[in-house]
Amino acid sequence: MKSIEIKGTVRTDVGKKATHELRKNNGVPCVLYGVQKDENGLPVATHFSVPTEGLRNLVYTPHIYVVDLNIDGKIVNAILKDIQFHPVTDAILHVDFYQIDEAKPIVMEVPVQLEGLAEGVRAGGKLALQLRKLKVKALYNVIPERLVVDVTSLGLGKTVKVGELSYEGLELINAKEAVVCAVKLTRAARGAAATAGK
């Protein structure tokens, strides 16, 4: 998995007025949930801010990254956990990061990449990707940049379900019956099948 560095500044004032002022100046309020726990057993949270520009390459991309967070000079390995967007302008309102514990598995969404020319496509069908990303659970250093699904032997009207896939070191979290991709019958393929059946 690729890594990306993001520089942030610790926030001392996290009130509404300060947050509004921060956003007005093209800053994004962020929270890092650490591996350390507080007295209630909850992850210790660090509030910090990042310039909007500094988040673009992380947010607006099909790729997944380990984030090297540089908060006032302190480097922490983290993953992007959640983003809130403005409902009208799509501006980034808030970002949550989780610090990586190298000894514990993390859950991430990994892009799916279809490989091969499906038999069903050669027969006139259309290949449709239903799930663009799959949720995986694994140690962060074994999570790939993408999950490759070989569709070469996929026939007309056939599907690939999550339960049919397996990757070394990864646990797939999605429902086993969820359809990842399918070769759908087109009008031309239906016509050809009807003609062949006569």
Curated annotation (Swiss-Prot):
UniProt keyword annotation of Mitochondrion present: no
Record keywords, A-Z: Ribonucleoprotein, Ribosomal protein, RNA-binding, rRNA-binding
GO biological process: translation
Record CDD domains: Ribosomal_L25_TL5_CTC
Similarity annotation: Belongs to the bacterial ribosomal protein bL25 family. CTC subfamily.
Subunit composition and interactions: Part of the 50S ribosomal subunit; part of the 5S rRNA/L5/L18/L25 subcomplex. Contacts the 5S rRNA. Binds to the 5S rRNA independently of L5 and L18.
Name of the molecule in the record: Large ribosomal subunit protein bL25
Organism whose genome encodes this protein: Phocaeicola vulgatus (strain ATCC 8482 / DSM 1447 / JCM 5826 / CCUG 4940 / NBRC 14291 / NCTC 11154) (Bacteroides vulgatus)
Lineage, opening ranks: Bacteria, Pseudomonadati, Bacteroidota, Bacteroidia, Bacteroidales
